[in-house]
Amino acid sequence: MRASQVPNACSLLSLAMLFFPVTGTSKQNIPRLKLSYKDLLLSNSCIPFLGSTEGLDFRTLLLDEERGRLLVGAKDHIFLLNLVDLNKNVKKIYWPAAKEKMELCKLAGKDAHTDCANFIRVLQPYNRTHVYVCGTGAFHPLCGYIELGTHKEETIFRLDTQNLESGRLKCPFDPQQPFASVMADEYLYAGTASDFLGKDTALTRSLGPSHDHHYIRTDISEHYWLTGAKFIATFPIPDTYNPDDDKIYFFFREISQDSSTSDKTILSRVGRVCKNDMGGQRSLINKWTTFLKARLVCSIPGPEGADTHFDELQDIFLLSTRDERNPLVYGVFTTTSSVFKGSAVCVYSMADIRAVFNGPYAHKESADHRWVQYEGRIPYPRPGTCPSKTYDPLIKSTRDFPDEVISFIKRHPLMYKSVYPLTGGPVFTRINVDYRLTQIVVDHVMAEDGQYDVIFLGTDIGTVLKAVSITKEKWTKEEVVLEELQIFKHPSFISTMEISQKQQQLYIGSRDGLVQLSLHRCHTYGKACADCCLARDPYCAWDGNSCSRYAPTSKRRARRQDVKYGDPVAQCWDVEDSISHETADEKVIFGIEFNSTFLECIPKSQQASIRWYIQRSGEEHREELKADERIIKTEHGLLIRSLQRRDAGAYFCKAQEHTFIHTIVKLNLNVIENGQMESTQKTEDEEGRVRDLLTESRLRYKDYIQLVSSPSFSLDEYCEQMWHREKRRQRNKGGAKWKHVQEMKKKRNRRHHEPARPPST
């Protein structure tokens, strides 16, 4: 077993520096494409829900792909939306908290806006026509049923307010508390706090068929079971082909003293219970008798067991496979360290999780002792096993378990071994950035060169990262961040995400908004085959005319795509021609001697490295430009200060990604001698020359400051402004010559067009 000790602050810092590059030093960790909220709207790949207002807190989503609809739980509202367009045929139910409950909530010291309202936290499909719904009810949770039509076209959408019931142990009191629930066979499984203060947490089962109500919960008297648990997700997952073995798996984090120190730490867990658990006969009555839990580890292995841990579980996503018993488990974790802030994504297999639950139990003599492996005799049937006729015909229910099985599981709910990632460590990390990961969804995508899991990650600042982990030679992993998308106008904590593979859309909720986002924006990568291949997006391929959505086809090499290496030379027939003939955009730039000029070059990819080359006038060879005090390289181009005559020539801006180098733009710089400008100015009359020189000096100084401070302000725009200014000055200069004629025209117009005046009296 690997050591699970928590490194001290110094070792954490050194490990962070060892494993994780400082921001800005690794081009590969930078998102290749960064799109703003405005960019997404212009690309028609983002649809914000227009029915939202600030503070509605869109935290709960229920996706119904079969009928093409999305149920959204928010503050005092439940929305029924169209999956194709969130703003089409919107229906809503207004369900506020009772006024007396709101007053009691405020008297208890809670905030009137963020606490004392009815925040919808449960939306679970009960049957074909009804959805079970629960809201916090201003710290007095309530539950009920929403009636829906069975078909998409039906307009039924109403809450049965006559049959509301208490939501205690089904829904949290606090709207901000992490919470998980799932409906299975008409039973509601929920992990939540059972009291107003949120100290007592429990995993419960309620509801059920009318003839078979069996309320079950965790044992509050056993502190080994749960300690300050924060539930993240829960899922029904079959273990075998025998339905009697079906289990509910739940993922959470809790306070623990698993380490060798006396300090309390937060650890992530995976737990499970049997679906057919009925509680005990003489002990653990109406309590789980099959409750087990194990540690879920997401860490970077370090020297001598000093691993760098990401201990706080934030979200879980199950990626379905062909075998429903073995989905892949994707988890988002964050650090608890005060030394550095980081997030990671780890992947687990159900086979590894089951192996831990079938392994040794942990034992603790008392609260002052450490957890050790239990070496004693394990009672029969094995604690945690579901009762099944095929396993033992004499044990038909958990109420038939022997007393020693019940006693054992009360004291030994924790497994000794931990569950480790399938790949040995995280498949994705974010370190030394100003945000943390909060949500995850994953899509399994078929590409030309293989199959890839595309990961979509929500952050606490309202951005979505689109990434892919690529397996290279010798099973090494390459982490590629394809896009960083600002999906909200203002930074906002992303609290929920759902994916529709049928619609190829993400649905993302936060405190201040709800957004529908396309999984791909192939056209934004560029208009050339090379741009499409360099993107390495499994969704996109070059079809001969444009970068568009890839669809598997039987035609050999019908689409150009290279996710694994991103090599356009091997995929695009026109690349060699474009390299040899340099088919990049070409512009002519004019600069004035001794002034500054800016050569603009903005690569589409943030992962590209830029190099500048110059071919001076009258010379055959090119040389690479080196930055110095006069030549300054910026993210948006090249600033040349105190322009010299020898600076004239052709400037080539070249971008390199991986081994592929191509010219983005060619700029032909012409330097106008300062003497030419002076001789032109001497032809003007003395008065105008002095006035214009004073004005021009001030304006050029302003323009120079603007040019230096804003690299995005191109020299072309500067020259255009100068040209318009000169034209206006010339018009004003010649205006006096025609002043007399213009005055005569005005008099004539007044004489011909003045209305007749009434006679004076």
From Swiss-Prot:
Record's comment describing the protein's domains: Strong binding to neuropilin is mediated by the carboxy third of the protein.
Comp. bias intervals (Basic residues): 728-754
Signal sequence residues: 1-24
Similarity field: Belongs to the semaphorin family.
UniProt note on tissues of expression: Developing spinal cord and developing visual system. Collapsin-1, -2, -3, and -5 bind to overlapping but distinct axon tracts.
Domain Sema stretches: 32-519
Organism lineage string: Eukaryota, Metazoa, Chordata, Craniata, Vertebrata
Reported function: Induces the collapse and paralysis of neuronal growth cones. Could potentially act as repulsive cues toward specific neuronal populations. Binds to neuropilin.
PANTHER family: SEMAPHORIN, SEMAPHORIN-3D
Disordered: region residues: 728-761
Molecular function terms, GO-annotated: chemorepellent activity; neuropilin binding; semaphorin receptor binding
Major subcellular site: secreted
GO cellular component, one term: plasma membrane
Keyword set includes Ubl conjugation: no
Subcellular localization(s) per the UniProt record: Secreted
Cross-referenced Pfam families: Ig_6, Sema
Any one Gene Ontology BP term: axon guidance
Name of the molecule in the record: Semaphorin-3D
Residues bearing carbohydrate: N127, N595
